[in-house]
Amino acid sequence: VQTCALPICYRLGYDEALELMRTTSPGELYELAHRLRTRYQGKRIDTCSIMNARSGRCSEDCKWCAQSKFHKTDIDVYPLVGETEAVQEAAHNASKGVGRFSLVTSGRTLTDAETDRVCAIYRRIGREVPIRLCASLGLLTREQLVKLRESGVEHYHCNMETAPSYFSKLCSTHTPEEKIRTIEWAKEAGLKICSGGIIGMGESAEQRIEFA
């Protein structure tokens, strides 16, 4: 949590945020958040459309996700999409005024061969479609992330999902530390980061602050 009053920016610590939560009503917090957003962002929004570029049969057991092979769901299951289909989807979104386009794949990560296929898709989109590029492809290696950046991707998405102290209650097949490592590697590769989480999965109010 960070509050800014020009020219000084001040980042709240855990104890301060906890005290603010305990002594301020939800309505007051919503109003303060609205005022900060209005002051520093106004009515501007950043639009990003995602394409489910590989669906289902994920090896991870994340309790919140229908893509996991451990859950019985009725989602479509298909392999990595073709280049032409992805380019057409990006072009459709660009024609609607969307500013960013992201390929999102199920699964823990991509193989090097899959990474090369995805990078070829991004290079073609970059040549043919006026839209900025993002990616959400799992726990990639440093080398794979560098390839993405060289292919024109600007933002990498990797959600932390919840507080580190609660993560193991929701997922046992990877750790918050692995996510943090991926994010750090993405930064080193020159990518900007998009990372968030889900509120309301059984975590405590204190863990929500820990997550923030």
Question: What is each residue range found by the language model?
Answer:
Residues 197, 209-212:
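Oxyanion-binding "anion nests"
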Residues 2-6:
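Short, small-residue-biased leader/transition segments that mark boundaries at the very start
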